[in-house]
């Protein structure tokens, strides 16, 4: 069984992300496994990693892709790192279903 890049919490879901900034276009590259064995969602954004532009583009892209408001997607950790943790606010089961559908499974 494949591990998931997210964990459910009482008030939402935490999504592990590996971000590539300054890409040719913003998009989803699927799930990958880091060297530590932890699964992460591989995403790319066109914005550069300057003054939070890539993080803002990341949260906006995730919110739009999952049908959430921007305020429902917050950066928990990884502000200056490529590996990030995002908190998605809402019903955990509904959010998990949306993430699974986004991933194509």
Swiss-Prot record:
SMART domains: DUF167. Signal peptide: none annotated. One of its GO terms (cellular component) is cytoplasm. Belongs to the UPF0235 family. This is UPF0235 protein Mchl_2407. It comes from Methylorubrum extorquens (strain CM4 / NCIMB 13688).
């Amino acid at each position: 069984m494949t591990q998931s890049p997210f964990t459910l919490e009482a008030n939402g879901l935490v999504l592990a992300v590996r971000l590539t900034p300054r890409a040719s276009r913003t998009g989803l590259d699927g799930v990958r496994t880091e060297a530590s064995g932890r699964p992460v969602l591989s995403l790319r954004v066109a914005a550069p990693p300057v003054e939070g532009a890539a993080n803002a583009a990341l949260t906006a892209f995730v919110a739009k892709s999952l049908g959430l408001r921007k305020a429902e997607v917050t950066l928990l950790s990884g502000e200056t790192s490529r590996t990030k943790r995002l908190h998605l606010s809402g019903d955990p089961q509904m959010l998990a279903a949306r993430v699974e559908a986004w991933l194509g499974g």
